[in-house]
């Protein structure tokens, strides 16, 4: 039984202008529906493959601020989100999330600033700007993780050391076990290792499920670790 908050999305491409760049993204060609059956869903693929665009569209269509934060964040520093949010319909489950957060590495500074502005006596600021980038990013993620919450993370590994990525992995796994749902765009072979997750790959002209060992993040990392000198000799030959 699927008991996720967001159980799938359907696409209505007639709502997108034929000249839109969205219709030139190969992974989107022909896709009509995606199902989300697991508490953790990853989007992986090469840069520009559409994974962050889809994550953003799901977030905006579900009521989150395009730049990140909770549904209560209404600030805007730069209106850059795509029109894909107008072309998707979210299939919701019978449960409703108790909390939610959209976390983007690229707009983290703005979200952290907004958090300070929203702070009051009952909800004091965590003062993220007084911490290192990695410490503040992890703290913001951890401070907002709750059971039965909905979370959309765009490349959370960008600010985190491998050890901190493992810390985040543990937090995500435990929270998912307690009824939370996650959508995560990542290149991290560490985060992708979370057990019992679905991985949607956006490469090779389609959006399709794949296994952990089939992801480029895993394959390239494994190849480099196991054949470092041979690869460097080939790549750096003059």
Give residue ranges: language-model regions:
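Conserved D-loop beta-strand region of ABC ATPase nucleotide-binding domains
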Residues: 154, 184-185
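GG-anchored amphipathic helix commonly corresponding to the ABC/SMC/Rad50 NBD signature/C-loop
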Residues: 131-155, 163-175
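ABC ATPase nucleotide-binding domain signature region
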Residues: 42, 53-117
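N-terminal pre-Walker A segment at the start of P-loop NTPase domains
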Residues: 1-32, 37
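C-terminal lobe/lid and adjacent interdomain/linker elements of RecA-like ASCE P-loop ATPase modules
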Residues: 163-181, 188-238
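The conserved Walker
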Residues: 46-47
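Conserved glycine(s) of the Walker
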Residues: 50
């Amino acid at each position: 039984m699927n008991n996720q908050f967001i159980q799938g999305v359907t696409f209505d491409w007639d709502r997108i202008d034929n000249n839109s760049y969205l219709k030139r993204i190969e992974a989107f060609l022909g896709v009509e529906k995606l199902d989300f059956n697991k508490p953790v869903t990853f989007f992986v693929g090469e840069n520009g493959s559409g994974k962050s665009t889809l994550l953003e569209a799901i977030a905006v269509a579900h009521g989150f601020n395009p730049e990140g934060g909770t549904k209560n964040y209404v600030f805007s520093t730069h209106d850059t989100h795509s029109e894909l949010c107008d072309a998707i319909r979210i299939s919701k489950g019978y449960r409703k999330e108790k909390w939610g957060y959209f976390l983007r590495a690229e707009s983290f500074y703005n979200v952290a600033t907004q958090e300070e502005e929203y702070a009051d006596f009952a909800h004091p600021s965590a003062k993220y700007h007084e911490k290192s980038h990695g410490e503040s990013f992890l703290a913001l993620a951890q401070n907002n993780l709750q059971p039965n919450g909905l979370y959309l993370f765009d490349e959370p590994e960008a600010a985190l050391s491998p050890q901190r990525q493992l810390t985040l992995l543990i937090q995500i796994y435990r929270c998912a076990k307690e009824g939370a749902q996650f959508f995560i765009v990542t290149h991290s072979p560490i985060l992708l290792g979370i057990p019992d997750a679905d991985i949607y790959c956006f490469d090779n002209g389609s959006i399709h499920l794949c296994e952990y060992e089939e992801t480029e993040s895993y394959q390239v990392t494994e190849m480099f670790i196991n054949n470092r000198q041979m690869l460097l000799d080939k790549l750096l030959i003059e």
